[in-house]
């Protein structure tokens, strides 16, 4: 794994077509912007895993705090 240090407003490039820019840092959260061609999917890891499981026909149960809120 390549580990990089970037400041707010700085960008890193992945190949020729994908850029990742640090938009802000607040506490332990980092806001990033991803610029990629339309044919490149960009997802948060948990969303990517859900999509992958749905494609395989294996839908995992919602994690605590996610999904419908029973009342």
Swiss-Prot record:
Location(s), subcellular: Cytoplasm
Annotated spans, Disordered: 50-71
Main location as per UniProt: cytoplasm
Listed SUPFAM superfamilies: CsrA-like
Origin: domain of life: Bacteria
GO molecular function per UniProt: mRNA 5'-UTR binding
GO biological process, alphabetically ordered: mRNA catabolic process; negative regulation of translational initiation; positive regulation of translational initiation; regulation of carbohydrate metabolic process
Keyword entries, A-Z: Activator, Cytoplasm, Repressor, RNA-binding, Translation regulation
GO CC, one annotated term: cytosol
Gene3D superfamilies: Translational regulator CsrA
One Pfam family named in its UniProt record: CsrA
Protein function: A key translational regulator that binds mRNA to regulate translation initiation and/or mRNA stability. Mediates global changes in gene expression, shifting from rapid growth to stress survival by linking envelope stress, the stringent response and the catabolite repression systems. Usually binds in the 5'-UTR; binding at or near the Shine-Dalgarno sequence prevents ribosome-binding, repressing translation, binding elsewhere in the 5'-UTR can activate translation and/or stabilize the mRNA. Its function is antagonized by small RNA(s).
HAMAP family in the record: CsrA (MF_00167)
Family: Belongs to the CsrA/RsmA family.
Self-association state and partner proteins as the record states: Homodimer; the beta-strands of each monomer intercalate to form a hydrophobic core, while the alpha-helices form wings that extend away from the core.
Descriptive protein name: Translational regulator CsrA
Gene: csrA
